[in-house]
């Protein structure tokens, strides 16, 4: 279905810089997210008919659309307000009508969207694409989701003849840095199950995520003059290289897919005297996840034993877990979304998320929360784009879910 206000709503959201900040200790991590919630989203939520709209200390903006029919479930929809760690100031979207399959120039920059480099463009011939101007990201992750949820609510309020169950809407902060759901209030949200609207292409329906951990490693060296260094110098950077060299070369993001896990070196910095490395660890299987963490610890222990001192100091922190374990207990939310997509002639793409969503943590709080497509492609950078037609289909799915009767 065509929704007249969807595009303008989305464009309005994208132009607000809501980039999160991992170095910040506040919640939300940036004031711009608070401003976006309170000055743009909250008034709009009230104006389209949501009730009990309130902003919580955890950074979530929540509202309710009461049921106007007899339905068995209260259902929530969640999207995040922040955008990824890429320039988000001065977002100036381009609209490409009736995409013809050719190269898309991104504003006045030298950057282009070339189907040879991005073959996913070929899935959108004849559609309306929204791209960046090459200087920023677009913010489709996850302002597409916000716009789709708001548009669905707006449509239902304007069409009271369409019966639906009780709907709760939640827009939260800091998903991109993994903190958004840490303080999510399940009791306040008060639904039977929920969906994050934070996926990619048409049809994505996901209830499996990585289990995730972060590893921080300090390497303690000993710096002496290189001319007299024999049997005295301990080069911290070399220790870091030695550590990394003992990890399986095939277990890296660029060499894995599907259900394969990995170790990912995010950063390495230092001097001869001291170095620091940051890793993330990812796997879908619980035992493999534990084994990966244990393997890193064994490398550190072996190196320290060889060095005769605690020169490799490893700390590992769990970040989130595969929500499959929770959702598998009751697949109602997945089966419902799958059925609705099929009724809409959308082929469900049920694959694991090689990442995480707020739904990962929220599911482990007792609220099953799988992920629905929102439409974004090439997310987190200047090559990001989204199809308006896919966004419209996402609105169709949201409406279909809350109106579905067995």
Curated annotation (Swiss-Prot):
Enzymatic reactions: Release of the N-terminal residue from a tripeptide
Enzyme Commission identifier(s): 3.4.11.4
Keywords: Aminopeptidase, Cytoplasm, Hydrolase, Metal-binding, Metalloprotease, Protease, Zinc
Active-site residues, as the UniProt record annotates them: 82, 175 (proton acceptor)
Cofactor, how bound (note): Binds 2 Zn(2+) ions per subunit.
Positions with a binding annotation for Zn(2+) 2: 141, 176, 380
GO BP: peptide catabolic process; proteolysis
One Pfam match: M20_dimer
Record flagged with keyword Signal: no
UniProt record similarity statement: Belongs to the peptidase M20B family.
Protein name per Swiss-Prot or TrEMBL: Peptidase T
Species assigned in the record: Streptococcus mutans serotype c (strain ATCC 700610 / UA159)
